[in-house]
Regions:
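Structural preference for long, well-ordered alpha-helical segments within the folded cores
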Residues: 18-19, 78, 109
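N-terminal beta-strand motif that seeds the catalytic metal site of vicinal oxygen chelate
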Residues: 1-14, 44, 61-62, 124-138
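Conserved beta-strand in the GNAT
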Residues: 46-50, 114-116
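Vicinal oxygen chelate
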Residues: 3-11, 39, 54-138
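Short linear motifs in intrinsically disordered
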Residues: 25-30, 67, 90-94
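Core segments of cupin and vicinal oxygen chelate
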Residues: 2-46
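A short, sequence-level motif marking secondary-structure junctions
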Residues: 51-55, 120-121
Length: 138
């Protein structure tokens, strides 16, 4: 299953988790210090909340979660054929998860887009990969 990811900066993680739990009638899939994510079934959405006081209400980054690394590679190849520049990351730790991914470069409005798959849980927020720059504080 593929689904859209929306990563939001929030001022108050606890209040935001309470709000989105009610809005989507689901509990978060993962909660860590300064970080939470929801696997919303309907509509299919990965909602990520990153506590960044003073930046609440803004988009942190956007993404598409895909089922496996083969799909990450297929999407990266498709975008390369369409002329998109990408930055590949494999086996990185990002947002408390091990991931294979790539980032789309040079978006027209400067937003950060990733296509990724989750390989498993990770005890750390990030490992110095690009995720740490984009999601600083996740």
């Amino acid at each position: 299953m593929s689904r859209l990811q929306l990563a939001l900066n929030v001022d108050d993680l606890e209040a935001s988790v309470a709000f989105y739990s009610k809005l989507f009638a689901t509990e978060p899939a993962k909660v860590k210090p300064g970080y939470a994510n929801f696997a919303v079934a309907e509509p299919p959405l990965k909602l990520v909340l990153i506590e960044k006081r003073g930046s609440g209400g803004s988009i942190n980054h956007l993404g598409v979660e895909v089922p496996d690394t083969a799909e990450v590679e297929a999407q990266q190849e498709r975008l390369a054929q369409a002329g998109f520049a990408t930055v590949e990351e494999r086996g990185v730790e990002c947002c408390y998860a091990a991931q294979d991914k790539f980032w789309v470069e040079n978006t027209p409005n400067g937003e950060a887009w990733e296509v990724y798959t989750v390989l498993g849980d990770s005890p750390q927020a990030c490992d110095g990969s690009r995720c740490c720059e984009v999601s600083a504080g996740c």
